[in-house]
Amino acid sequence: VCDRDLVIPQERFSRDGARDLQDQIWRIAQSQGAEAFKPHKGSYIEDDHLPFLRAGLKVVNLIHWPFPKSWHTSGDTIDRCSADSLQQVGRVISEFIYRQGEPL
């Protein structure tokens, strides 16, 4: 979640299993102007979150999609990271966690 050209669509397994949490995260992102969080539905991405969803736990996968060409290659280096992208994700998730004690 730190690519310079970060794009985080609404991953579909998360949408199916934790729509309410995903909606909360995207509302926070919108209110903060976090442009990396895109309002469109993404793809079904098989990733580490699936066992949790299958166990009945609500989880949301925040993942850059489509994967950049450098993803998991020798070109996937620190210079491709962006402090702004990390800050957007960090602020959104911090606010999401903070709000968990509040009524919806």
State the predicted function of each range.
Residues 2-104:
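Active-site-adjacent substrate-binding region
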